[in-house]
Amino acid sequence: MLDAAVERKYSASPGETFYTGGGAQTFTNFESDDNSRILTVHRAFQHSVNLVFVRLMRDIVHYEMVQTTGPSSEWLGDTATRKMYLTRFADQESRVYMKRFYTKYHGKTPDQQITLLLLGVRKSPPKVATALRSVAPDQSNAWFNKMMYAALKNTPSASMLDDEDLANLYDKYGINRFNLNDRGYISSVHPLELWTLNYLRKHPDATLAQIETASQDVRLSTYSWLFKTRYHATQDRRIKRMVELRAFDAIGKSWQALGYPFASLTPSYAAAIGASGDRPAALAQLIGVIANGGNKVPTETLTQIDFAKDTPYETHFRRAVVAPQQQVSPEIASEVRMLLRDVVTGGTARRLAQGMTFPNGETLEVYGKTGTGDQRLNVYAKGARLIESRKVNRSATFVFALGDRFYGTLTAWVHEPYAARYDFTSALAVQLLKSMAPALQPLLDKPVQKTVTAVPAESTPAATKVAAH
């Protein structure tokens, strides 16, 4: 079954746009020659073909959606379940907005806050008036008039408005005349931005947590439109987003068990091709699990510490033996090891296809996986026209195992402004490891240390042995 799984075929075409709750994404392959091919997972793993793994990740996410939540008929067809997910979505997304607006206005003076708000308001008397009356409802007519003239300066409206017009605007767009959603519509400002600024002007020392608590009902009311039946298709997309997040959460937890170092996984298919941001130590731990037949063996720096030797206070601390934890079944570990070996024998790490030969003539089999990183900052104009592309980072990584004893990660990394000067692939990391054979020779000369279960020794006045975790 595992052999059949890695021979499953996927298109490597970059012509598809992939949609998740986070938005639309497109991907490219490192080698354009792969674009028209249909490849097995095995072959794509050998040659690092991105689009195959993007589509594989999509299948995994869809599988986890069913595993965590059930078939779509269960969470789209039940009214109570739909309401639960929509409420959860509204709460989650509104918190994102609240954090954004809190960061924007917190710590600024009242005048600075108003100036910052009006920068994003179109210079129309109704819009400016609604924004001002929403965030500062208790201010006087005189203050309102002053702010209106300042905001509309150098516009035709400024010369046309007299005191009577301003008084009418003051009354017409008062905070009690329209609900929050309507005021957001009139002013073209997000309703939660109006509410947040109004709250901060009254409670300048409020924390984000306090604002989130105080705004609980308000945040849900701003999404009242979402619960209307005429937005059924929109509701379905939001519900799918929440179910999808549960799937990514489940995937993230399974990755954490194998050493993934972060608390959550970015909900994107790009996680399958490196966007998840693994650290070198985490990659080394993962291949260590594969090298140990699926077992996670604890990392040890010190195994024993001796204090006050040959004195009455002599004490020995010995690390307690921890049994290996089975993280991956031996069958899966064996299959992955085969794939990793094929990367070296016929894929992107071919420079070590004959193994790694050391100065003493000994040759160790090598298996591993390469990865090339080309992180760019792209700036787009209207119409998705690319106007700037700047290299931010360039990296080449090889996570490897040598024989049955050694494994690790080797990464070459260049940060801007120097990244633009370099153009290399993961072959650099492979060649670098190959050239390090003389430096690694002393490791081979050390005898293999057998792990022996410690047996507590009898305590004597001159020697106390303590097991330490």
Annotated model-derived regions:
Residues 51, 55-57, 67-112, 231-239:
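N-terminal leader/propeptide and maturation segments of large enzyme subunits in energy/redox metabolism
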Residues 2, 42-43, 54, 103-237, ...:
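A penicillin-recognizing enzyme superfamily signal
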Residues 257-271:
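Extracellular-facing binding/remodeling surfaces
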Residues 67-70, 78-79, 244-261:
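Short, charged, amphipathic alpha-helices and their helix-cap/turn boundaries
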Residues 1-35, 75-101:
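Extended charged low-complexity segments that act as oligomerization/scaffolding linkers
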Residues 22-68, 72, 348-350, 372:
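Polyanion-binding and phosphate-handling cores
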